[in-house]
């Protein structure tokens, strides 16, 4: 019985891990599906304007759009500036 319990409990843990991973993937996909069509171009243009004035790598800038309510959107811009 102990051997059977071992395998059954492992399947539950594996199933829970798989379920959690799937939930994360679905949440990420929903996050990007809610972005407006103009958002990728907006990111590129913001990055190009910043690069005009500050010499930085593109990975040092993150742009994120969060939806708080149906009528409120928040555009978050994080820039790691060089010394």
Curated annotation (Swiss-Prot):
One biological process term in Gene Ontology: regulation of division septum assembly
InterPro entries: MinE (IPR005527), MinE_sf (IPR036707)
Pfam families the record matches: MinE
Top-level taxon of the source organism: Bacteria
UniProt keyword list: Cell cycle, Cell division
Family: Belongs to the MinE family.
Function as written in the Swiss-Prot or TrEMBL entry: Prevents the cell division inhibition by proteins MinC and MinD at internal division sites while permitting inhibition at polar sites. This ensures cell division at the proper site by restricting the formation of a division septum at the midpoint of the long axis of the cell.
Protein's name in the database: Cell division topological specificity factor
Organism lineage string: Bacteria, Pseudomonadati, Pseudomonadota, Gammaproteobacteria, Enterobacterales
